[in-house]
């Protein structure tokens, strides 16, 4: 089997401090979990799944839970915008491209706040032409997707945003990709592999690429990355029993990259004990 080259990745972990509002929300999630466990609330009103979803939204952007909350200056969204703009600016001559993955807060087209529109609006405000930024969700036929992917490969569309289901397997736009951004943490190791497989791919003209992972410290981000690591370890144990040498090398690389961005403060450790069933 041919061992064709793929780009070398530089992993950049952007670990950001939570806002005061986010810290208050995390404390409230713990209280909600206690009430759910004690059956003090109707499960149709609140439950562990709802708390988890709210926790993930809080870690991504506090405005997803309350649009009236301020736009935190050092949020994941604003840090991603800053990085994406810098990469875009540095790659003007070669028309390099970027992918931004975000599984939560996808565009609905109904006027409600979402991360996709917020990112695009801020990038346009910085000077990026709107036609160079695309959402995969706006291309709902195979013909439209093929046209979009061709524009990305040609460097006409230079920033493409999407979710794992829509921008994962089968997306071949690697030609000019220079950077990939994880705005939120996927649920499954295979999702992470699918996302990063878009850029760490044969046919990429760039020898070195950047992969940004954004984590809001002391929020559910840490919990989600911990779950991902636990699942990867389980899969790795199975792999190791089948092929010790090769699997061990793969496991070490994966485990280290997860461990670097894992931050488990006391509140997250407490939630992990309460919700250990979610790792099953």
Go through the PLM ranges and name each one.
Residues 1-72, 76, 83-86, 98, ...:
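Inter-lobe connector of SF1/SF2 helicase motors
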Residues 9-11, 129-132, 157, 175-180, ...:
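Short glycine-/polar-rich loops that comprise or flank the Walker A/P-loop
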Residues 19-23, 105-107, 140-141, 166-168, ...:
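Conserved nucleotide-binding/hydrolysis micro-motifs of P-loop NTPases
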Residues 40-51, 93-119:
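Conserved strand-helix element at the start of the C-terminal RecA-like helicase core
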Residues 108, 146, 160-182, 188-205:
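SF2 helicase motor core recognition
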Residues 120, 124, 129-164:
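Conserved helicase ATPase core of P-loop NTP-dependent helicases/translocases
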Residues 190-193, 199-275:
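A conserved SF2-helicase RecA2
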């Amino acid at each position: 089997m041919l061992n064709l080259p793929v780009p070398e990745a530089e992993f950049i972990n952007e670990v950001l401090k939570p806002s005061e509002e986010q810290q208050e929300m995390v404390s409230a999630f713990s209280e909600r979990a206690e009430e759910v466990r004690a059956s003090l609330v109707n499960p149709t009103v609140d439950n562990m799944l709802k708390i988890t979803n709210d926790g993930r939204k809080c870690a991504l952007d506090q405005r997803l839970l309350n649009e009236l909350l301020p736009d935190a200056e050092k949020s994941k969204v604003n840090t991603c915008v800053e990085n994406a703009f810098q990469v875009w600016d540095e790659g003007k001559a070669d028309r390099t491209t970027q992918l931004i993955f975000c599984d939560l807060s996808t565009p609905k087209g109904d006027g409600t706040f979402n991360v996709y529109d917020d990112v695009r609006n801020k990038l346009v405000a910085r000077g990026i032409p709107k036609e160079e930024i695309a959402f995969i969700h706006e291309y709902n036929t195979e013909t439209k997707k093929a046209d979009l992917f061709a524009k990305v490969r040609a460097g006409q569309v230079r920033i493409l945003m999407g979710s794992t289901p829509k921008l994962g397997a089968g997306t071949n736009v690697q030609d000019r990709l220079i950077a990939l951004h994880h705005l939120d943490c996927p649920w499954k190791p295979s999702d992470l592999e699918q996302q990063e497989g878009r850029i760490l791919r044969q046919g990429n003209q760039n020898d070195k690429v950047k992969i940004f992972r954004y984590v809001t410290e002391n929020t559910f981000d840490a919990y989600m990355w911990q779950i991902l690591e636990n699942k990867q370890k389980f899969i790795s144990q199975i792999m190791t029993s089948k092929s010790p040498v090769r699997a061990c090398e793969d496991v070490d690389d994966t485990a280290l990259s997860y461990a670097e961005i894992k931050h488990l403060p006391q509140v997250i450790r407490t939630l992990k004990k309460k919700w250990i069933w979610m790792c099953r």
